[in-house]
Amino acid sequence: MSKTKVNVTIDESGDVDRLLQTMPDVLQHKQLPKALRAGAKPIIRDAKQRVSQPGYPGDKPGKEPLKNTIHAVIRKYEYTSIAVVGCTWPDGNHGWLVEFGHDITRTKGGPVFGHVPPYPFMRPAIDATRSEVAGSVLLVLQMGVREFNSQ
């Protein structure tokens, strides 16, 4: 994944937080990664539509198109889980340059010969899918609670 960090907190009236507080820890640890993966899917889908298509002027020859490097990685920790959505390394390691733009130099720290403007694709995807993400996460967690209660 890229070194650039974008933190997103989704709070739809606190529904997800309230649901997590009522869930037993064992159930949270099992269902939260599933919910995060479901929540990452709309962001990935939207970002893939927004990113420059293969063959754009700054495309890296011989590497996977940037569109195909957008993935989610779910990381589990002792008390929580997180979803990291972004361009995977090594083929997508230039994703942050596309997202934020950059100066053109011939050597590191050398004179600037031009500037490549930013073409944001991740941040707009996050903003556009915020309610869909919250709904997906909430739905998966609710299904997990129903499944747990029916056992």
Language model: regions and residue ranges:
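Short, Lys/Arg-rich flexible segments
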Residues: 1-84, 90-91, 102-151
